[in-house]
Every structure is written in structure tokens, then in C-alpha cells.
Amino acid sequence: MALSGNCSRYYPRDQGAAVPNSFPEVIELNVGGQVYFTRHSTLISIPHSLLWKMFSPKRDTANDLAKDSKGRFFIDRDGFLFRYILDYLRDRQVVLPDHFPERGRLKREAEYFQLPDLVKLLAPEDVKQSPDEFCHSDFEDASQGSDTRICPPSSLLPHDRKWGFITVGYRGSCTLGREGQADAKFRRVPRILVCGRISLAKEVFGETLNESRDPDRAPERYTSRFYLKFKHLERAFDMLSECGFHMVACNSSVTASFVNQYTEDKIWSSYTEYVFYREPSRWSSSHCDCCCKNGKGDKGESGTSCNDLSTSSCDSQSEASSPQETVICGPVTRQSNIQTLDRPIKKGPVQLIQQSEMRRKSDLLRTLTSGSRESNISSKKKAAKEKLSIEEELEKCIQDFLKIKIPDRFPERKHPWQSELLRKYHL
């Protein structure tokens, strides 16, 4: 039986033809300006996800998707974080770098692409710790086998914890030629490195600290990747000194290498580190200062002085406060120096030693003053001798010049310029 042109053939569902796939095997994506190449099977590996809906072969949606000028499928999302989405689509796992700062943004991308399992993997890291809990020290220190000490978070630390170490290091170089050359290149410091606790480094250097190599770190953590925006060591030392730091150690290593085999110039390169430390404020001297101001300067009828009052006040305060915050001042033993006409005081061994020390100091002072006077006199004599020597040299020059005799008549010269010169000066 023949069928008319308006009739169409019926295919049952189990025997129907498969819907052709309009997507190529390798798909080129443009995600926020970043270009990615991936397989079509990777994009549709997780059912009911957004990428599965976009690139599913059951619907012909290839013409509905946005494309850029080069025909690549365009997705208006973060191109940097999309690499982790692709990693998860490949093997259901994602490996993030250490101290990854954009975990929250990656979680938002996973929610957008409708990947619930990836959202669960990223969710536990977003839970904030309560203030009563403690956090461990740096993961880098723990991985290197250091002591895993437990330290409280920055919110629980006392406000006056401002003590610690800061290490300042630099790699410098200088070129020195032969002695007497003026074109020698002096010290060159390309970069000043800063190591230590982040809170201390920010307190000392402030806006001059470059944190681009180690950003988004807690203030109580330690770093060795900060450096300063200026190149003057003395400026860094001044800033450390103004904040109460003093240098406790330093080390340096120097190497020399020739510029080339034809010259004697040497390039000296060195790496130097300076360790600075600021001590904690253990006690305050305000109470003792107040007692000294209120007390009498001279001894009164009771025989007590300002020092006695200050020591007694310090003793009373040391009993009330903790031993870590105060310094206990011991009692001051004083000897009575009462003298009468009937009974002269015998000089003890201590007084004899003190007198000998005073004599020794006076003798040393005399020798120093006499030495300085002699040096001044000798310097004046040397200056006078130098002046005389200059005058003598001038006199010798004048005498030598007077001894020069110019002949009345010069012999004839062979060259014409010589005769012209003689005629010019009428010789």
C-alpha cells in the first residue's frame, strides 16, 4: 500500500532512532576570558548539574548557548576558579593549594554550577572557630617537624603582647677595583627582607611593608616572605629603634668573584641578617616615681630619705601584685657616719679600697689631660713645620727661576716655525 506525501512514518520508542549529538568531542570554552579545552563527556559527567543541562545531547541547545567572536562557548563566571570545577568533574576530587584564600568564592561557584558534593567538601572549612577554642601554629612549621605548640587566637591574646623577634636580612653587592680608582661601585641593596610575627612587622613598618608574597595571613602567624618598599638599611634600623627594638645578633657571609679575566675588579656579594628583640614590659615604675615625688629630698628628723620611701613603697606593692609584673626591691642597708671630736673613725678596708680607686681615677684623668695637651702642642708644631716647608719650597723655586739664563742670540734653526717664533719675541 502506498503512502501519501503528507503521512510520516511512526517509530516506536524502543525502536526509534537516537537523537544526534550536535556537540563536538572536544569543546572549547571561554570562561571569563580564560580559554579551556575539555572533552564533552567531562562536562556531562555529573547528571543534573548546570553544565550537564547546558551540554546535554538530549536537547539541541548548541545554538542557544552564547559564543564569543571565535566561536567558543562563553560562560560568564570566574575563569581562575573554573579550573577547580573541571578538576572535580574529571575524578570527583579537588586539591587546593596551601592557605588557599578564595575558598568561599569557590564554594559559590560550586553552588552556581549545581555541584552539591563539591559544596559539601568546601563547607567544613568555612565554619569559624569559637573564641574559646585554640588554633595550632603554622601548617608550614608543623610539616617541617617543629614543635606543635598550641596558641590562642588573636582575639584572646592580651593587648600588651608586643614583644618578640624580628629578623631583617638583605643580599648586597659591591664592586671594588684597584686602589685609588674613583669609579668603584658601593653597596647595592636590591631588597630588604623581613621575617617574624606578622603583627610585630606591621606595627613597626606599617605601610612600607610589602605583603604581596604572603597575603591574607593571621596577625599571630609567622612569615619569612615580607620585604620592604625602600632600600635603605639605616631607615629600617631607625624604625625598629623607635619601636623599642634592639639588635641581639647578626651574621653575614661574603663571597668574591672576578668580573673577567682581563681586569682585577672583584664583585663582592654578601647575605647579612640582623636579629632584633623587644622585651616584654614586666613592671611599671609609675608608683615608685609618685612616691619619690611626694617624699622629701633630704633627710628629716626620722632619718629616712627619698630612696627609703621608694623602696618601702615598692616592697608593699610587690606583695599585692603578681611576681611576673613587679620587681621586688630589697631593703637598703645604710651605715651611720656620725663623727665626734672625742672618737675619730677608723678607716676600714672598704674605705681604703674606695680611696685607692679614687686616686687611680684621678691619675688616669691627669694622664689623659696631659696626653691631650701634648697632642695639641705637637699638632701645632707640625702645622708650623708644614707652613715653613711650603715657604722654603717657594723660595727654592724662585731661586731656581732666577738661575735660568736666556742667551742673547740663538743659533739659526732649520725649521721655519722656530725662526718665526724667535722673530715674534724679538730674540
Swiss-Prot record:
CDD domains: BTB_POZ_KCTD16, H1_KCTD16. GO terms for molecular function: G protein-coupled neurotransmitter receptor activity involved in regulation of postsynaptic membrane potential; G protein-coupled neurotransmitter receptor activity involved in regulation of presynaptic membrane potential. The modification Phosphoserine is found at S130, S137, S143, S146. Expressed in the brain, mainly in the hippocampus. One of its GO terms (cellular component) is postsynaptic membrane. The gene is Kctd16. Homopentamer; forms an open pentamer. In contrast to other BTB domain-containing proteins, does not interact with CUL3. Interacts as a tetramer with GABBR1 and GABBR2. Disulfide bonds: none annotated. It is found in: Presynaptic cell membrane; Postsynaptic cell membrane. This is BTB/POZ domain-containing protein KCTD16. Auxiliary subunit of GABA-B receptors that determine the pharmacology and kinetics of the receptor response. Increases agonist potency and markedly alter the G-protein signaling of the receptors by accelerating onset and promoting desensitization. It comes from Mus musculus (Mouse). The modification Phosphotyrosine is found at Y112. Residues 25-98 form the BTB domain. Its main location: membrane. Keywords: Cell membrane, Cell projection, Membrane, Phosphoprotein, Postsynaptic cell membrane, Synapse. GO terms for biological process: behavioral fear response; memory; protein homooligomerization; regulation of G protein-coupled receptor signaling pathway.
